[in-house]
Amino acid sequence: MKFSVLAAAAVVAAALASPALAADPTGLWQTPTNGGQVRIARCGQALCGTLITSDHIRADPNQRDARNKDESQRGRTLRGLPMLSGFTGGPTEWRGGSVYNPADGGTYRGTITMTGDNSLRLRGCIVAPLCKTQTWTRIQ
C-alpha cells in the first residue's frame, strides 16, 4: 500500500513539474501602449512576434516605420512588422532575443517571461540596467 501511495505521489509530482503544463507564449497579445497587438509564434526553435495592429495602424493602415534607425527600413509598413525575434529557452522564460520598438526605431536585447497563462513580461534592455519592462495580456 505504501508503495502505491508513493508511486502515485511521484506521478503527480512529475506531472506538476512537466514543461507541458507551462503556459505557451504563442498567440495574440495586447501591449500596454498604443493599442498594439502582437502575434507571437514559433519560428524554428525560437519565438518571434509580428505587429498585427495598433492605434497608428487603425488610423492609417499604410503607416510606415518612419523612426527606424536604419534608413533603408523606413519604407516598411507597420502592419506585419517583425518586432520580436530569436528568443530561445522556455518553458517559462525565453532569452537572447531582440525587441524592435517602432515608437523610437530602436532594437533591444530582450527576455520574455510567462507570468501566468494569460500574461507575460517583456523586458528590453539597451544595456543592463537600462531596461524597460511591459506586461502583455493574452487576447487569444
Describe each PLM feature range:
Residues 1-5:
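Positively charged n-region of N-terminal signal peptides that target proteins for export
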Residues 7-15:
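Bacterial N-terminal signal peptides
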Residues 18-22:
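Sec/Tat signal peptide C-region and signal peptidase I cleavage site
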Residues 25-26, 32-103, 107-108:
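Central antiparallel beta-sheet cores of small beta-barrel/beta-sandwich binding domains
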Residues 104, 109-113, 119-133:
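Short, exposed beta-strand-loop hairpins at the edges of beta-sheets
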Residues 139-140:
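Short, solvent-exposed mixed-charge patches
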